[in-house]
Amino acid sequence: MAKLGPGQGLGCEAAEGSLVPSRKREYKPCGKHTEGKRPLYAIGFNFMDARYYDVFATVGGNRVTTYRCLENGSFALLQAYVDEDKDESFYTLSWARDHVDGSPLLVAAGSNGIIRVINCATEKLAKSFVGHGDSINEIRTQPLKPSLIISASKDESVRLWNVHTGICILIFAGAGGHRNEVLSVDFHPSDIERFASCGMDNTVKIWSMKEFWLYVDKSYSWTDLPSKFPTKYVQFPVLIAAVHSNYVDCTRWLGDFILSKSVDNEIVLWEPKTKEQSPGEGSIDILQKYPVPECDIWFIKFSCDFHFNQLAIGNREGKIYVWEVQSSPPVLIARLYNQQCKSPIRQTAVSFDGSTILGAGEDGTIWRWDEVDHPSSRN
């Protein structure tokens, strides 16, 4: 299966954003909170339930913590889960929802390769999923069906799980799969059967679950042991794209387009053009580039607000760049920094409306910036 490189689409010149901030929205540094000395690798707001839009979670070491953003610019600690294995190091988290009673679920995983599902309503560990043969680098939740999650692993596979029944439904690996660690995954926002993955083999792959969707349906009504479920292997993606020349450590859909980044100080927006009748064939067209200075180390992930208006990404010097995602050429809204923040920002979290931006630091600190003219920042 041929890899598609850049410039095989329409051949248009990619629009590159300027690093001069437009100051369309201005932010001020607010609270900070240091959890400990172990790095924070992930942070995320709960977009799965409108009741909890101001709630976010972090993972660092063997600890998963939830907080509420207060209007005065500080945080309120809500819950903390400490894994029984003191050597566990969580790398990723994702919010999900129980499809029966609507309870907020927090899913986390890391170096042990075990997925932990925490029920935040009962404050208990609800389930643990075992199956991956190595550490898990990212988990994402299906926004249209928030009881489905997908996990990307060092074992070169991606797995689809039902958090309600505990079933591993599909495994994406094999002949057309990744050839090194899978670092990031993301579900298509409106096509429930499609997702993208990327990793250390320098590729982004687009997968379709269309032919296997009956197994997804079956996973909800399965009454036997989860281990007896007829889990299926999916070996071939519908598209393999070589947009980058190094590790690809973060990918997100923007409508039918894809945002992805490597270790070369930029995020790329591109259009995949797949041919449903000919898996693996198609073309890609690079549309835009969002420069991010000093972003040349791997495992730095970006995030967006709920409506994908703003994108925030940290760098190895502790700065955060906030881009207006959908303008062309891209517009840099703001460059955020705090004199005290000197270590890499591994992941950001942008609030529902973009008025609060959080950074998870490698020094174990959560950093917060609030929009200056927003009602919540006037106290």
UniProtKB/Swiss-Prot annotation:
Q: In which tissues is it expressed?
A: Widely expressed. Expressed in the embryo sac before pollination. After pollination, its expression persists, predominantly in the embryo and at lower levels in the endosperm.
Q: Which GO terms describe its biological process?
A: heterochromatin formation; negative regulation of transcription by RNA polymerase II
Which InterPro entries does the record associate with it? G-protein_beta_WD-40_rep (IPR020472), PcG_WD-repeat (IPR051243), WD40/YVTN_repeat-like_dom_sf (IPR015943), WD40_repeat_CS (IPR019775), WD40_repeat_dom_sf (IPR036322), WD40_rpt (IPR001680)
Q: Does the keyword Transcription regulation apply?
A: yes
State if Repeat is listed as a keyword.
yes
Kindly list the GO CC terms recorded for this protein.
Answer: ESC/E(Z) complex
- Keywords associated with the record: Chromatin regulator, Nucleus, Repeat, Repressor, Transcription, Transcription regulation, WD repeat
Can you say where in the cell this protein is located?
A: Nucleus
According to its UniProt entry, the function of this protein is described as: Polycomb group (PcG) protein. PcG proteins act by forming multiprotein complexes, which are required to maintain the transcriptionally repressive state of homeotic genes throughout development. PcG proteins are not required to initiate repression, but to maintain it during later stages of development. They probably act via the methylation of histones, rendering chromatin heritably changed in its expressibility.
Kindly give the PANTHER family that the UniProt entry links to this protein: POLYCOMB PROTEIN
Question: Could you say which protein family the record assigns here?
Answer: Belongs to the WD repeat ESC family.
What is the protein name for this chain? Answer: Polycomb group protein FIE2
Native organism is Zea mays (Maize)
Gene this protein is translated from: FIE2
